[in-house]
Amino acid sequence: MALLTAATRLLGAKNSSCLVLAARHASASSTNLKDVLSNLIPKEQARIKTFKQQHGKTVVGQITVDMMYGGMRGMKGLVYETSVLDPDEGIRFRGYSIPECQKMLPKAKGGEEPLPEGLFWLLVTGQMPTEEQVSWLSREWAKRAALPSHVVTMLDNFPTNLHPMSQLSAAITALNSESNFARAYAEGMNRAKYWELIYEDCMDLIAKLPCVAAKIYRNLYREGSSIGAIDSRLDWSHNFTNMLGYTDPQFTELMRLYLTIHSDHEGGNVSAHTSHLVGSALSDPYLSFAAAMNGLAGPLHGLANQEVLVWLTQLQKEVGKDVSDEKLRDYIWNTLNSGRVVPGYGHAVLRKTDPRYSCQREFALKHLPKDPMFKLVAQLYKIVPNILLEQGKAKNPWPNVDAHSGVLLQYYGMTEMNYYTVLFGVSRALGVLAQLIWSRALGFPLERPKSMSTDGLMKFVDSK
């Protein structure tokens, strides 16, 4: 038990994480994120070195044949510092729950939702930032946001039938021309300095992503109209919504919430694991994140909210917009009895309602309580879990984040469902790139697990 507790400390539980304590003692007045990191990293390197010396041979868990054939589900095999997924409480960012982040992270003047800049600071340092630190990040990203001309030209020349995620991945890969890390590595550099150049690349990439994403949106859906210029007085999300062409302050608030809650979800999901794996080869952040986006583009990872909207639209066509609970129950049972699933319900890890769903529901109750699509989502929330429990197949009958996000985007006029995964990708950069900085700071090696063939596995089992 003591060893498990020690492992939990390493992974960042709020009440025991030395990293959080160190962060709170690290130049709390500094608004320069790199300076704060420079203070934190040697302490964390020493802490982990001692931990490995004392417990390096400790067995953390067992691996079963089912795990090997089942996508390594539940297998403990990664160290990922920025977030931990609790089956009952949901995601914790450096130990803080989503409700705690909503309450404690700085907000825009007159706003009610957390600023994603603040979450990035928290993910990188383990420390709740001040308003001044968040403002520094907003200005810093605004300074770094300009796109090189070759990337603009490439985006402008993509065919309109090229999927938005393909465009995003290609543009991020092309931004590799700007990599500080790749240049320094080619010239020969001390590995102790890796994290510093990775940090610079991650900051540049996060700054440029809204410009790339907005350009893709304008080219595909707004006849190639200009995204305009970055305003250094505005926060990251506000600049993003301006470049997309949306001026409703409520949509900007939604984007702040969306970009915050989709940012990170532990290290085992496809996009997070991909960036970690590719980064372990010392590929620069642009190449690592582009690979992550190719994983996110897969229908089993990043297309779930799109599938929810398609299903909701089909439901409305078949039973009408003002459907009774009884008719809705019949429709859901017909869906399940035909071998299909109710999209947006269930999760690989969670065993309660996804807190990311809950905070979006609260946003909708506040801003769009009479919207027909939201009312349908709320009605499903009341009915579906009980049916899934009655059916007896689902381990988790509760809604996840994807059951709600598309409805909110549709309400504010963003109806282009093929684009939704791009928004997800912009958000996910905050988490996986924060971790990438720490992966290089802590000297994580090339990832190289052992594989086995089915014949080899059978022989191994027979020998037991």
UniProtKB/Swiss-Prot annotation:
SUPFAM superfamilies hit by this protein: Citrate synthase
Pathway assigned to this chain's UniProt record: Carbohydrate metabolism; tricarboxylic acid cycle; isocitrate from oxaloacetate: step 1/2
Keyword Electron transport listed: no
Transit peptide location: 1-27
PTMs per UniProt: Methylated. Trimethylation at Lys-395 by CSKMT decreases citrate synthase activity. In response to mitochondrial stress, the precursor protein is ubiquitinated by the SIFI complex in the cytoplasm before mitochondrial import, leading to its degradation. Within the SIFI complex, UBR4 initiates ubiquitin chain that are further elongated or branched by KCMF1.
Gene3D superfamilies named in the record: Citrate Synthase, domain 1, Cytochrome P450-Terp, domain 2
GO cellular component terms, A-Z: mitochondrial matrix; mitochondrion
Active site: 301, 347, 402
UniProt xrefs under InterPro entries: Citrate_synth-like_lrg_a-sub (IPR016142), Citrate_synth-like_sm_a-sub (IPR016143), Citrate_synthase (IPR002020), Citrate_synthase_AS (IPR019810), Citrate_synthase_euk (IPR010109), Citrate_synthase_sf (IPR036969)
GO MF annotation list: acyltransferase activity, acyl groups converted into alkyl on transfer; citrate (Si)-synthase activity; identical protein binding
N6,N6,N6-trimethyllysine PTM positions: 395
Protein EC: 2.3.3.1
Principal cellular location given in the protein's record: mitochondrion
Pfam families to which the protein is assigned, alphabetical: Citrate_synt
Gene Ontology biological process terms, A to Z: carbohydrate metabolic process; citrate metabolic process; tricarboxylic acid cycle
Compartmental location: Mitochondrion matrix
Summary of the function given for this chain in its UniProt record: Key enzyme of the Krebs tricarboxylic acid cycle which catalyzes the synthesis of citrate from acetyl coenzyme A and oxaloacetate.
PANTHER family found in the cross-reference section: CITRATE SYNTHASE, CITRATE SYNTHASE, MITOCHONDRIAL
Quaternary structure, from the entry: Homodimer.
Other facts: Citrate synthase is found in nearly all cells capable of oxidative metabolism.
Protein name: Citrate synthase, mitochondrial
